[in-house]
Amino acid sequence: MKYLSFFILSLSTYLVGMHHEKLDVVVFAIDLEIIENQDSNARDFVSRITNNVKDKEPQTLVYQYHFSKKENKVFLLEIYPNNEAALIHMNNFLGSKWETEFVQNFTIKNFQVLGNANSELKKSLEPFTKDFRSNLIGFDRVADQLGEEISKIK
């Protein structure tokens, strides 16, 4: 699991370093804890919300929950090609049954937003985090080779 987490964090950092004009990736890196006695509910919720995001948010590039062996710690990785796609996700989430169930099952321990989050996205994330880390230095070979195809995902 450590290697998988390292790979995922490396990939997200790698994607965040993109400097492709059409791609300005935003990453949500979220450490969660399952609320006591909510293990089975949390797993059921994760399955349902993942299917919902996959069906309703085609621009979401990555949406993955990673459970620890003890199942009380969870890492949620979300990757969006741009601010607009991240905002679509937040607009679908805020005030919905998904948000209600999320807070019934999880406590947010750490939430970092990686990438160039605009003011509108930052405002939508205010209830959850104030930890925004913009791109400073980096490169991305994936963006150089696949950036145009990724940006065409609708």
Task: Annotate each language-model stretch with its function.
Residues 1-4:
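Positively charged n-region of N-terminal signal peptides that target proteins for export
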Residues 6-8:
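Short helix-onset patch at the extreme N-terminus, typifying the N->h transition
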Residues 10-74, 81-91, 104-154:
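Short S/T/G/P-rich N-terminal loop/turn motif that feeds into the first structured element of a domain
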